[in-house]
Amino acid sequence: MIKIIRKIGFFLLICFVLAISCSPATETDTQTKSFTKSFLWEVSSDVNTIYILGSVHVAEANIYPLNDVIEDAYDQSAIIVAEIDITNISEEELGMLLMEKGMYPAGESLETHISSELYSRVSERILELDPTGFLLSYANVFEPWVVAVTITDFDYMQLGYDAEYGIDLYFLEKANTDGKQVLEFESAEFQLGLFDSLSDEIQIMMLEDAIDNPVTKAEMEDLFTAWNTGDASTMELLVFEGIEEHPEYQRLYNKIIDDRNFLMVEKIETYLQGNVIHFVVVGAGHLVGDNGIINLLDEKGYDTLQL
């Protein structure tokens, strides 16, 4: 059975710009399916049409060029909408927010907040990544979720996946070059605050998972097979399968998925009532499932078409 905490990590990869981990492959064989669609939807009201693209926040360079239908939808749009505009926040500002949301107060540390056995395993894993010990001293002042993010980011980079090639960043930079207006649903402070609001138990489980289950190339390939082929069914399985069996995680999903989807749909409806075409780029996990953005818009009577 897939570890449920891995599925939380997977969701964060495809639904938060500040992401952490990836779920193991399901038994679904995405390689044997034949899909001709992209992870892009055209959504129409009586007066306007917009486009909604599911993003993955880290990728390999060879993901580009993207499907022509995606680029054409971008070209037709006057305004780009992302979860957060990560091109509009400096590294210094992000660093200050990270210290505010993820750093322990003076006199406290990761070592004093987790078991000695877990800290020993964390230290061993981090020293594998950085034998100088600098990274370990840095990590020790941060909460478990920050350390989990750091470890998994190294996993991504070692496999050749980087936020530099993330789909959201690609379109934000493109919009800046083309002089298109950029809007954001959330802020970096809001997203970091969601991580920080996770219980100690969930944060520690995320940290254990980052140590015990390093991201693999096969996992990432399965994810991108689903994305490249527009396989929304497999993406939904990767995000949601088995969650209903664990009420504690269902509550967490309600907070980090459903509540955010409802707020995004409210804003999307305002775009659909206007006369300007918007190109919305959000994590692919936001688009699938009963409370996914696409299904919510469909239930409200808007026409949704996967391209």
Question: Where are the regions that the model predicts?
Answer:
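Bacterial N-terminal signal peptides that target proteins for export
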Residues: 2-10
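Glycine-centered loop/turn motif at secondary-structure junctions
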Residues: 21, 130-133, 179, 275, ...
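N-terminal low-complexity, Pro/Thr/Ser-rich intrinsically disordered segments
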Residues: 27-42
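Structured, acidic catalytic/metal-binding patches in enzyme active sites
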Residues: 40, 44-252
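A conditional alpha-helix N-cap/helix-loop micro-motif detector
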Residues: 33, 63, 164, 257-261
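Bacterial signal peptide processing site
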Residues: 23-25
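A cross-kingdom marker for long, charged
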Residues: 250-307
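Bacterial N-terminal signal peptides
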Residues: 11-19
